[in-house]
A protein has these predicted regions:
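Short, Lys/Arg- and Gly-enriched loop/turn segments at beta-strand edges
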Residues: 24-30, 56-57
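A short, hydrophobic, proline-anchored segment that marks a local hinge/packing element in signaling
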Residues: 30-40, 48
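Gly/Pro-rich turn-and-neighbor structural signature
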Residues: 1-24, 128-179
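Feature captures the catalytic cores and cofactor-binding loops of soluble hydro-lyases/lyases
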Residues: 1-4, 37, 57
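A short, polar/charged loop-to-alpha-helix boundary motif
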Residues: 54-63
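N-terminal leader/propeptide and maturation segments of large enzyme subunits in energy/redox metabolism
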Residues: 76-151
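Glycine-rich acetyl-CoA-binding "A-motif" of GNAT/NAT acetyltransferases
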Residues: 43
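Solvent-exposed alpha-helices and their adjacent loops that cap or buttress functional pockets
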Residues: 7-10, 26-28, 39-40, 69, ...
């Protein structure tokens, strides 16, 4: 989202959701809700959660194993503001509720994810207050450094060349041929 819209798109008090499979890499029932975290008016991170919603308006509640295209799975949303300046976007929320079979459940799932995000924000800010942003950045950088070193160790003995692999699923739910 930042790549597409820029970092200035994120504002204090805003909460976003997205379920676009081509963006998130999961099916449409997996909803990501996230919010920027600001500390002293500076963007310092994000809180996020992903949850499987029972129904997002697809042909079958819970997901469709026999769908042949994405439009049968339900509504597909790019990153969209659920809240702006700490106020819910009632039109978007109502649209979500009326396009699913279980609007009350959808709203409950959404509110649970928002509460989880607010808890994450509160705890992250308490860590910043306790240790300071410089130490948190140093710890993050050290984690990245150690991860890179371990990755390089893992591949250093692999000889140069071309490698390939094949994989199969049992079937696609529409037939019995391996895919």
């Amino acid at each position: 989202t930042a790549k597409i819209r820029g970092w200035d798109y994120f504002k204090e008090g805003d909460i976003y959701f997205v379920n676009d499979s081509y963006f998130t890499g999961t099916h449409l029932n997996d909803i990501t809700i996230f919010a920027p975290i600001f500390w002293k008016h500076k963007l310092v991170g994000f809180s996020a959660s992903r949850a499987h919603w029972l129904d997002v308006g697809g042909k079958d509640p819970g997901g469709s194993m026999d769908s042949t295209n994405i439009y049968q799975e339900g509504f597909r949303w790019p990153t969209t503001k659920l809240y702006e300046n700490n106020k819910p976007n009632k039109e978007i929320i109502e649209f979500l509720k009326i396009n699913g079979r279980f609007g009350y459940s959808l709203e409950g799932d959404m509110n649970a994810q928002i509460a989880a995000g607010k808890t994450g924000e509160k705890r992250f800010k308490s860590i910043i207050d306790r240790f300071g942003l410089d130490l948190i950045h140093a710890a993050r950088d050290e984690i990245f450094k150690q991860s890179e070193e371990l990755e390089r160790q893992a591949v250093k003995d692999i000889k140069d060349g071309e490698y390939y692999a094949e994989g199969f699923l049992d079937d696609d739910g529409l037939g019995s041929d391996p895919i």
